[in-house]
Amino acid sequence: PYKYGFGPFAGEIYRAPMSYPFREENPQITGKEAAERAILMIQKQIGADQVAAIIIEPIQGEGGFIVPSEGFLPRIAEFAKENGIVFIADEVQSGFCRTGEWFAVQHEGVVPDLVTTAKGIAGGMPLSAVTGRAELLDAVHAGGLGGTYGGNPVACAAALAAIETMEAQDLRARAREIEATVKGRLGALRDELGDGIIGDIRGRGGMLAIEFVKAGSAATTKQPDAEITKKIADYCLKEGVIILTCGTYGNVIRLLPPLVIGDELLVDGLDVLEAAIRANS
């Protein structure tokens, strides 16, 4: 949706299907099989020898906080390596302890050629970075990477302090604690409501989401319900809890609590979210 009204766009950019466990036509498809589906599209429509790079979010952000099935990322990375394709992980949303590891690719031991980061890298200060193999980054001529405000010393100092805090407070472990609390609470609510409006609960660490569907459709058509999602978000806002929606169909609520959040405040926020879901079920 973000490209609406913009253009023209750069040519020769192709989009391959992601692993989306909740909405796969075949619910039994494995991550590796989903990867082979994407690879087949690349081979048939483009040709592996014509691909310069593959860029992927290890966990899709605006697309709906989609965690691919286990095995998907390693197979895509393997395909890239086999064919001399640069494999780029977009960790702008998922990086720096957000998912319970420093980077989301680490959950499956994937090592990208390049990693893009921003957001969490500097604790809110404007900073982004590209990190990767020396042979790639050193190939760029002097001044070829960056811009007028590249390497801003204040933002870089903030990033160093933020990373030190992540290490000192072990925010990777804290992200995993948040995941356990949130999934436990929401999972119990879904079980109680039965075949209601909660279609899927997913995510890793402190990067979590709820996908809402029409009541009674979670196990069958999984019909997206953007209207109910907006009502829930509005309810939360009125009660002082700011949450954001995302997803292709606008039917996903994403939860991104600060990794330094205390248990009491986290539970307070979940209380409001649960009340909002109950009020709209």
Where are these regions (language model features)?
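Conserved N-terminal phosphate-binding loop of PLP-dependent enzymes in the Aspartate aminotransferase
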Residues: 1-281
